[in-house]
C-alpha cells in the first residue's frame, strides 16, 4: 500500500513542496528567509484579523479605537505591537532575502524573480496603507505627502489624486478605502507567494556556489525543516524582545498625536523600511523626476537578469563583484540614514551622491566589474 502522503491529491502537493522536495545539500542560512517571510505573513494576517475586530475606520474614532485596543482589549497591546513590529521583521527578512538573491545570482530564475519583485511592491503598498490606519499625525501627513506624488503624473495627475482620496483631501473616504485595501492585499500577497513557489519548484533552488546541484540533492524534510525551525525560533525571539522591551523603538512619537490637518509635523518621514526610497525621492528637486526615481529604485531589480554579464552565476568566486555588492549595501544604509534626516546641508548633497551611486553601481559598475572578472579568467 502506498503512502497517503504521496497519493492524496491535496496532501501530495504539500509533500512535493515541503517534505520530499529535493533540495541542494549546501544551501546556507541565507536560504532560511523564504520560510521566515511565510511565517511573517501568517503572523501579520492573524494579528491583523484580531485588530480588525476592534478597529473602526472612521476619522472620528480610528485613533481612539487603537487606544481602546491597547488599553481595554485582552492582550490588545500585545497584538498591536506584534503587528507593528512584525512589519519591521517582515521587511528585514525581505531585504535579506532580496540581498541573498542578488549575491548568489538567484535572479536568473526570471519568473520567480519577477514575481518576487511584484511581491515586494505589494508588501510595500500594504505597509504604507497600514501605517495610515492609526490616524496619528504621521499617518495623516505621510498619506497626504505620498498620495500627492501622483499629482506629478502629467494631465491626469490631479484627477487621479482626488479619485484616490475620494474627495479634495485625505479624509474619511481615504481612511475607509485604505483599510479595505490593507485587509485584502495580504491575501493577494499569499496567492502571489503560491505562484512564487510554483515557479521556484519548476527549477529547484539555487545554491551558494551557483552551480547545478542535480547530482547532490537531499530531502527537504528533515534536513531543512529542522534548519527552518531554528530560524523561526530566532525570528520569534527577536520579535518578542522588540515587542516586550521596546515596542516603540522603530515607531514615530508623532503618531501618538491624533491627526490634525491644520498642524504639520516638523519632519514628515515614513517608517524606517521606506527611508532609502524616500531619500532617493527627496534627492531630486523635480517632482516627477523624484517620483520616477522612487519607482525605478525598486523596479530596477527587474533589470538584474539582463545586466548579468558574468560567466559565473554566484558572487561566491568573484571577489571584485563582492566588493561592489557590499558598497551597494553600505550605500543603502547611507540612504536609510539620510531619509530620516531633515532637508538641510550637508544631508541634501549626501543623499544626492548616495542616490547617484545607487543607480551607477547597479547599471554601470556591477556589469563592468563582471566583464573585467571574465577577462581576468580568460573567459
Swiss-Prot record:
GO MF entry, a single one: ubiquinol-cytochrome-c reductase activity
Location of the protein in the cell: Mitochondrion inner membrane
GO cellular component, one term: respiratory chain complex III
GO annotation, biological process: mitochondrial electron transport, ubiquinol to cytochrome c
Key word Cell division present: no
Binding site for a ubiquinone: 201
Record note on quaternary structure: The cytochrome bc1 complex contains 11 subunits: 3 respiratory subunits (MT-CYB, CYC1 and UQCRFS1), 2 core proteins (UQCRC1 and UQCRC2) and 6 low-molecular weight proteins (UQCRH/QCR6, UQCRB/QCR7, UQCRQ/QCR8, UQCR10/QCR9, UQCR11/QCR10 and a cleavage product of UQCRFS1). This cytochrome bc1 complex then forms a dimer.
Name listed for the protein in its UniProt record: Cytochrome b
Organism listed in the record: Spermophilus musicus
Lineage of origin: Eukaryota, Metazoa, Chordata, Craniata, Vertebrata
Gene, per the UniProt record: MT-CYB
